[in-house]
């Protein structure tokens, strides 16, 4: 033990003055060696304070500031970036002491939470936490967590005390998982999955705790634990966990929708669709939970896969989903109609009562009541309070039902905006009826009734001069779409053998059409058509390579670099690109652009890949996981290996690995 740490511990132990203790703990600790200085400081000073100290100011100082700040300062040191010591010297001793000193367990686990929270709130840190040591400690923590849960139940603590005790464990476990598995960019959550027994325990604890909560909804802290755990779950394990999940749990974790791809059709068939049809409707669960799950899963029926241009959900499942939701919407419409009629009827009754004999100002009635009171009758029998309270209860219940109906209606309409319901007259009529009862955003209705176009447009027309077309689009003049598209299709065709200057001029025209002039009303399909025309020109064209010779010196000059740079720059400006276009773009970039001999072109290609993957990675592994692995990732990997190219993209955005 170093001299200054030894002296500090001795000074603290030798004084009874709390002010002096506080000052000693407030000083900046300069730790140079983990084993020789940090370990004795924690074990011989800070842990004893947490276990023995009676002064709350000193206790809170160590728990919320001294220990968390000390750990953070150590992590910031590159020499201590391998963080096995955080578990062995900080977390494990805190947990062990909580098991020994039950009366201080809350303070000790709270301190563990504070340490991990301090690390999480400093995202700039660059560190690596060994997975094996984490898994061992996580298992130990869960065992203690379950034991504590049993002890709390046995002690029959008040609800608020029991809740705070369990929440601190739940929050700590969530932070522990994030610290262990989200710390290293080289090991993202898609590559690291928790063992099934740990996952099963986590979900069981979360659901058991939520079941004791008087509120039906899952609290935010428990929800965070469920979301973190789902991110660390392999789809194969999710398939085993789903049958045990309650609907409110599934509603929470379905926000990590991209993990459910391999099992989503079965999930709709077994768990979701039955709830949408009578007589099962609403009997076994909260309908709002099911609607939330369906909405969270909307990419599975709203986005077409790259490999076959079809949604991941089967046609029959989507058809049943439409039918079930339409039936629910019809029932909700009837309920809203009844509510509206009752409100109108109630309003009429109020108007009639003002003209009748029920007036509070009727002198004969008041005289009669006064006489009853004077004869000893209980005036409370006639004051109407009980009837008013019953009426208020009924009104509150009706208002709650109406609010629930409106919430469910809006959620169903949101789902239909992703479903692209077929243009059926009965659906349009139902929307018109609903608009008379509740406020519905017109843009939402437009989206619901819009037709989904998947076919690429065809253009027939004459071929015009490119310079003339460029002047036309630059001047924002009325555009002859057919002429422009036919001309570009001709000039950009590989078979046409266009000169380099013609190709560059074509790219400039497209740049004005898609980027610089947004008033040309280019549809999504037309944009895709133009992109398909330019992508083949990302491959180096040998006819644009000139060879210069001067004596024995030979130099090759690639005149096509400018063209390829223009194309990649255009694609970057069009970002975010439509998902449907990635099936053409990603393999082309992986096969040609990343291996381009020009470093500028190569750099632009990696910029584009980085943007695409950061935006669409969850969609690619959630909907197109097989295509992503076979048609893009392996192509990129082979290109990088063959050309000895280093990129972090292969580590940051891996495909799903086979499950053990």
UniProtKB/Swiss-Prot annotation:
Outcome reported for the amino acid change (mutating residue 16 to R): Does not affect interaction with CDC53
Keyword Oxidoreductase tagged: no
Key words of the record: Isopeptide bond, Ubl conjugation, Ubl conjugation pathway
Ranges for region Disordered: 339-364
GO cellular component: a single term: mitochondrion
Cystine bridges: none
Any GO BP annotation: negative regulation of protein ubiquitination
Glycyl lysine isopeptide (Lys-Gly) (interchain with G-Cter in NEDD8) crosslink residues: 16
Annotated Acidic residues bias: 351-363
Record PTM: Neddylated at Lys-16.
Function: Assembly factor of SCF (SKP1-CUL1-F-box protein) E3 ubiquitin ligase complexes that promotes the exchange of the substrate-recognition F-box subunit in SCF complexes, thereby playing a key role in the cellular repertoire of SCF complexes. Acts as a F-box protein exchange factor. Involved in the aging process. Longevity-assurance protein.
Quaternary assembly: Interacts with unneddylated cullin CDC53.
Additional record remark: Present with 195 molecules/cell in log phase SD medium.
Protein name: Cullin-associated NEDD8-dissociated protein 1 homolog
């Amino acid at each position: 033990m170093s001299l200054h740490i030894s002296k500090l511990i001795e000074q603290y132990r030798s004084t009874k003055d709390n002010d002096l203790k506080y000052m000693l703990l407030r000083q900046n600790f300069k730790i140079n060696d983990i084993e020789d200085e940090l370990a004795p400081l924690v074990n011989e000073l800070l842990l004893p304070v947490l276990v023995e100290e009676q002064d709350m100011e000193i206790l809170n100082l160590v728990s919320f500031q001294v220990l968390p700040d000390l750990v953070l300062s150590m992590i910031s040191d590159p020499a201590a970036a391998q963080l096995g010591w955080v578990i062995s010297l900080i977390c494990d001793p805190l947990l062990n002491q909580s098991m020994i000193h039950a009366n201080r367990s809350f303070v000790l686990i709270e301190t563990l939470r504070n340490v991990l929270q301090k690390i999480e709130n400093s995202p700039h840190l660059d560190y690596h936490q060994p997975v094996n040591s984490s898994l061992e400690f996580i298992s130990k923590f869960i065992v203690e967590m379950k034991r504590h849960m049993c002890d709390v139940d046995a002690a029959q603590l008040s609800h608020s005390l029991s809740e705070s005790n369990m929440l601190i464990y739940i929050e700590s476990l969530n932070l522990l998982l994030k610290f262990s598995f989200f710390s290293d960019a080289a090991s993202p959550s898609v590559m690291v999955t928790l063992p099934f027994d740990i996952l099963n325990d986590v979900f069981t604890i979360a659901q058991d705790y939520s079941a004791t909560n008087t509120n039906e909804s899952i609290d935010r802290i428990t929800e965070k634990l469920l979301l973190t755990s789902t991110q660390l779950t392999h789809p194969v394990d999710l398939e085993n966990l789903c049958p045990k999940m309650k609907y409110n749990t599934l509603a929470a974790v379905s926000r990590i929708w991209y993990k459910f791809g391999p099992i989503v059709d079965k999930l709709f068939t077994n768990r979701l669709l039955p709830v949408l049809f009578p007589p099962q409707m609403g009997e076994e669960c909260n309908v709002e939970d099911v609607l939330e799950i369906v909405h969270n899963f909307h990419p599975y029926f709203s986005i077409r896969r790259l490999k076959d241009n079809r949604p991941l959900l089967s046609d029959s499942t989507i058809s049943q989903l439409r039918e079930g939701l339409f039936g629910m919407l019809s029932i909700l419409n009837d309920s809203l109609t009844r509510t509206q009629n009752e409100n109108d009827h109630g309003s009429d009754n109020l108007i009639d009562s003002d003209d009748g004999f029920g007036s509070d100002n009727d002198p004969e009635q008041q005289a009669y009541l006064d006489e009853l009171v004077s004869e000893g009758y209980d005036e409370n029998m006639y004051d109407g309070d009980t009837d008013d309270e019953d009426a208020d209860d009924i009104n509150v219940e009706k208002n709650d039902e109406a609010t629930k109906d409106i919430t469910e209606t809006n959620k169903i309409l949101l789902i239909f905006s992703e479903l692209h319901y077929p243009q059926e007259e009965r659906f349009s009529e139902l929307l018109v009826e609903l608009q008379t009862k509740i406020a519905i955003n017109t843009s939402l209705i437009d989206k619901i009734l819009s037709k989904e176009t998947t076919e690429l447009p065809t253009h027939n027309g004459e071929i015009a001069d490119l310079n003339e077309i460029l002047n036309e689009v630059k001047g924002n003049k009325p555009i002859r779409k057919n002429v422009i598209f036919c001309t570009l299709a001709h000039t950009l065709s590989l078979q046409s053998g266009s000169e380099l200057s013609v190709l560059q001029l074509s790219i400039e025209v497209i740049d004005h059409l898609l980027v610089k002039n947004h008033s040309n009303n280019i549809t999504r399909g037309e944009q895709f058509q133009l992109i398909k025309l330019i992508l083949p020109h990302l491959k180096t064209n040998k006819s644009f390579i000139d060879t210069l010779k001067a004596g024995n010196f030979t130099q090759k000059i690639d005149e096509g670099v400018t063209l390829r740079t223009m194309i990649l720059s255009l694609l970057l400006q069009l970002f975010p690109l439509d998902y449907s276009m990635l099936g053409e773009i990603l393999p082309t970039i992986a096969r040609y652009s990343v291996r381009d001999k020009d470093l500028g072109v190569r750099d632009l290609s990696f910029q584009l890949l980085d943007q695409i993957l950061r935006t669409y990675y969850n969609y690619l592994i959630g909907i197109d996981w097989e295509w992503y692995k076979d048609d893009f990732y392996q192509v990129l990997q082979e290109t990088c290996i063959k050309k000895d190219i280093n990129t972090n993209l292969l580590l940051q955005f891996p495909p799903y690995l086979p499950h053990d």
